[in-house]
Amino acid sequence: MRYLLAALILLSAKPAYTQDKVISFSSAKKQMVKIYQANPNASTFYCACNIKWTGKKGMPDSESCGYTPRNELTKKGNVNKRAKRIEWEHVMPAFRFGSQLQCWQNGGRKACKKVKAFKQMEGDLHNLVPAVGELNADRSNYRFGMIEGEKRRYGQCDFEVEFKAKKAEPPEAVRGDIARTYFYMADRYGLKLSKYQRKLLGVWGRSDPVDNWERERNPAASISQIL
């Protein structure tokens, strides 16, 4: 409970979410599109790219943020479409919260799709952010942490992935957002965080305070989950 209180205090404007309404992942993504389209200054989570909308589909404006794909082409030689589209990323990956449920042990994400507890976590709007598809793919279900050196694989986007170690290092500007999201998910759903995670996230939360967009985004997410 102390982590939930800490997260709520840091967020300042995020109302307590106590009801048990379940929103499917597909519906949650549609709600997030509405929230982000309502803010003309909204940008992608990791690279801070402006978002160009065509209907409900978003595309990252790479020129606005200096993002360049790690892979322009796929292994088959085709254009890397995921580098040109917005995807809705779980800040705390589905693997991290799903693997703490029995259904995951019985058959992974597919088995958990039928379980209310998993569906509720999967569709929680507070845990969803718009990311360049390539980064969503590269981050996979890797844990967040610090990576030695500054290997820039995505142009000016300060997002690093250590594939062998299965670790991703996000930009400083969103580390607090990540910390508050993890603490929220842990307390809202009774999920376990390691001692190392709590310590690291605590540092991130203090070094990156709540910004105006968080104050606007989180109440909107809460309202969308209630209505």
Regions from the PLM with identified roles:
Residues M1-A7:
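Sec-dependent signal peptide recognition
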Residues Q19-R85, L201-V203, E216-A220:
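Aromatic-lined ligand-binding clefts that engage carbohydrates, nucleic acids, or primary amines
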Residues E63, P69-L227:
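Domain-level detector of nuclease and nuclease-like folds
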